[in-house]
Amino acid sequence: MDLSILIPTYNNINYLKLLCKSLKENSNFQHQLIFHINDGSDGSLEFIKNENYLYTHSKDNIGLCSSIKEASKLIKNDYVLYTHDDMYFCKDWDIFLKNEINKIQNKYFYLSGASVSYKDSYIHYDCGKSYENFNIKKFNDFCLVDNSPDYKASHYAPHVVHKDLWNKVDGFSLDFDPGDGSDPDFCMKLWLENVRIFKCISKFKVYHFGSVTTRKKNIKLNKGTKKFLLKYGFNPKFFRKYYLKSDGVLKYAGPVTEPIFSFTFLIDIIINKLKYYYFKIT
């Protein structure tokens, strides 16, 4: 099972090298790696060229969604995986993913990897706070013995969908550039196409250093929550809680169902509608 892996990057060469190392050493199939290099003056453009990877390039930082739009033009495989450039993939990650996809036997799914990190994540386990002190052996050993269950998936990378589904919803929405809110928007578009399997595969682990790009001082984020609210009538938190049923780290319990009406649902939707109309008139 070969994947097309989309990787946007913005001057994170040391993390990028670590990501590429993990995909090279820990994969079992010949995946198609497609990078979009924003700027690349830190040496990342030269690195990708020297490694003969497929890539697109922009002189300036064009934002996450536009980066993915450019890279996705080169997709050739049936499954599309999106990942951050500051992640390290565990051994045999693609075997675990392949086994799960084979169980489903249809195209209507959203599967994600379980993020391991020293801070907020599915699994809290400190293997280092940066590429400089990352303990690969500690992470590998942890992956071998950890028996965490599969989780209800939220809208976090890395995630994989079928190419037909990716094309049907047109990938990430450009109106969410430079990127905040693009992940829940992508999942909402999948929901509207009747995807109900949103599952995080615990054995498919990545170590995440915590959104290195968005922590840069020169990155100005868009108001993704507001954009999402104006587009759908409720915010991403409401979507996670009542649609994905994943407001927190929760054990997977099967395909999600339609939102269930309750008193808390009523209160939350009223609050969201009030915010919606406030944003519309301001």
Label for each model-derived stretch:
Residues 58-75:
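Glycine-rich, basic loop-to-helix element that forms the pyrophosphate-binding segment
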Residues 21-30:
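Short, acidic, metal-binding catalytic loop of nucleotide-sugar glycosyltransferases
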Residues 110, 120-123, 128-151, 155-160, ...:
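C-terminal, non-catalytic tails of nucleotide-sugar-dependent glycosyltransferases
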Residues 91-130:
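Conserved donor NDP-sugar-binding/catalytic core segment of glycosyltransferases
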Residues 2-4, 32, 185:
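Cell-envelope/extracellular polymer assembly enzymes that use nucleotide-activated donors
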Residues 29, 37-46:
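A conserved acidic beta->alpha catalytic loop
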Residues 80:
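Short aromatic/hydrophobic "clamp" motif used to bind/position activated sugar donors
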Residues 152-170, 176-204:
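A short, conserved alpha-helix in the catalytic core of glycosyltransferases
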